[in-house]
Amino acid sequence: MSKKYFGTDGIRGRVGEYPITPDFMLKLGWAAGMAFRKMGACKVLVGKDTRISGYMFESALEAGLTSAGADVMLLGPMPTPAIAYLSRTFQAEAGIVISASHNPHDDNGIKFFSGKGTKLPDELELMIEELLDTPMTVVESSKIGKVSRINDASGRYIEFCKSSVPTGTSFSGLRIVIDCAHGATYKVAPSVFRELGAEVVVLSAQPNGLNINDNCGSTHMGQLQAAVLSEHADLGIAFDGDGDRVLMVDHTGAIVDGDELLYIIARDLHERGKLQGGVVGTLMSNLGLELALADLGIPFVRANVGDRYVIAELLERNWLVGGENSGHVVCFNHTTTGDAIIAALQVLMALKTRNEGLAQTRQALRKCPQVLINVRFGGGESPLEHPAVKEASARVTQAMAGRGRVLLRKSGTEPLVRVMVEGEDESQVRGYAEELAKLVTEVSA
């Protein structure tokens, strides 16, 4: 059964446009509360990023949840993975995050976590959707839920992040720049790295509700690259608005993407005999990652794009490490979902163990040229179903004769078609990608 509201990563859209409206959030809170209450006594944690609309939606969700008899614990601005962690430690039935991740401030959305800190099962999302289409009824007055605020949430999460590296670990002597994207990591990330001994220069940690992800963070790396050079730092770390993506910059100012971070973490675990199985990437993972892992004898499989699919594959195989080139990195040996701060700490530990800088360590992975072009399209039939697009994709794949890949897919969160071509010759790859992107644009007109 297809879902009406839930996408690949919860519910997301433009603020003020259905369903990202206060009245829908009120009803969503009620529907979620009713669904969670079927599991017994109901306690729900609610956190958010720094978007100005978060206050509005927090109040609406709070009203809806309590009207269904659920108790609500408000966490305030916190990284998405912190809500997953705290949902477990508070033994809540669920955690809710108000965020649109790496999107600009005029988007917002809702993500749900189970009480185990994992994404909600499909059947529970479907139950919530069914309840959304029924009349809203308030529980009797004596059963209305209570609301409390958790004032030490940041401190709890900071200590959890620090616990992901061995006791006594010190990054003293390491000079780093971190870009918090004016988002949910703005308080906790500087504290984590400073308390572990690093010298920290902080960028984009003055959220005003409107500047989240605005020319900063993991989707706009220029500011961090410049700062690493001007500050003579050892490396830079960029988070996205809700703290579940991380990218890095080495001391030369070069960007280190999620594929490279995943390789560094996996190789470190492998060398210490703690990898447990293989590595999960996605259809967008660079071919070079697969080849480099193969050289180490590490199995590699590709999941669909989206961290929930990476997580599902990890769970099915009982493996520990997976991620996306966009910077979602999952370390199941420490947490239940993609966590940018914890992933960054694992990279720093790997560098410390090898006594290498990031620029040196990343050389072990030689990436194949990969060109990604995003093509925006309107409503109607997907351009991917057009015969001309299918024929061109097959022709390009055949022309690369097994030494490259073509991937055309719709975004799960935006009206975009992603055109990706990968191979050994960069000019050839770019030519093929531009040819396919032009064709997708033409058939979308």
UniProtKB/Swiss-Prot annotation:
Mg(2+) binds at residues 101, 240, 242, 244. Activated by phosphorylation. The active site is at 101 (phosphoserine intermediate). SUPFAM superfamilies: Phosphoglucomutase, C-terminal domain, Phosphoglucomutase, first 3 domains. The modification Phosphoserine is found at residue 101. Signal peptide: none annotated. InterPro entries: A-D-PHexomutase_a/b/a-I, A-D-PHexomutase_a/b/a-I/II/III, A-D-PHexomutase_a/b/a-II, A-D-PHexomutase_a/b/a-III, A-D-PHexomutase_C, A-D-PHexomutase_C_sf, A-D-PHexomutase_CS, Alpha-D-phosphohexomutase_SF. Its EC number is 5.4.2.10. It comes from the Bacteria. One of its GO terms (cellular component) is cytosol. This is Phosphoglucosamine mutase.
